[in-house]
């Protein structure tokens, strides 16, 4: 996310993002992008009227996760993309928690999709990596900046990621089955008020 936002935004630009998101992403946007003159606006997750109202001539990107972290709110990607297209603002979805097994935001027309490969894609909690998807021409500035910032992955990290991808489909099938069973059990439990699943 750092490479994408730093390569696509300049002083005076603004981004609007739904407030349910990974705290480090929110921290980077609110504390660090502001030092470079980029304005960050947060709106309640799923409130597309509030998101539209926050958009102005300086808005360059709409940002969300789907599902969100930590509440697992599924964002309506069709509305998200439609709002971006109607206002000519680029869209970014962090789909880490869904993984490409469950959700492919590019197929909805999202401009950029992020995944933390450290989590489900790697699967063994032993690598740090990320994935950014989008049009090749739109990613060219990111490729340039990542070399400057030093965020190029080692061959060993890529080996670990490839190892994780070999079992990715099986792990996600089991993860989905187990998650469904646990959610159904908890929904029936008398001491549980609400289940986020």
Predicted regions and their residues:
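Conserved PLP-enzyme active-site core in the AAT-like
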Residues: 1-189, 196
């Amino acid at each position: 996310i750092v490479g994408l936002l730093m390569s696509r935004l300049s002083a005076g630009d603004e981004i609007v993002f739904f407030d349910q998101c990974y705290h480090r992403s929110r921290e980077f946007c609110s504390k660090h992008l502001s030092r470079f003159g980029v304005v960050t606006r947060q709106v309640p997750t799923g409130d597309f009227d509030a998101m539209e109202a926050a958009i102005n001539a300086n808005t360059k990107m709409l940002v969300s996760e789907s599902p969100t972290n930590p509440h697992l709110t599924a964002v309506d990607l069709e509305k998200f993309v439609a709002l971006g297209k109607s206002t000519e603002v680029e869209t970014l979805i962090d789909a880490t928690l869904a993984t490409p097994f469950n959700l492919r935001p590019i197929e909805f027309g999202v401009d950029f999709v992020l995944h933390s490969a450290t989590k489900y894609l790697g699967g063994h909690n032993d690598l740090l990596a990320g994935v950014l998807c989008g049009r090749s021409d739109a990613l060219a500035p990111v490729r340039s900046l990542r070399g400057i910032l030093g965020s190029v992955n080692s061959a060993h990290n890529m080996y670990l990621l490839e190892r994780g991808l070999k079992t990715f489909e099986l792990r996600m099938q089991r993860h989905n089955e187990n998650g469904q069973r646990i959610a159904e059990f908890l929904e029936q439990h008398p001491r549980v008020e609400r289940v986020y699943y």
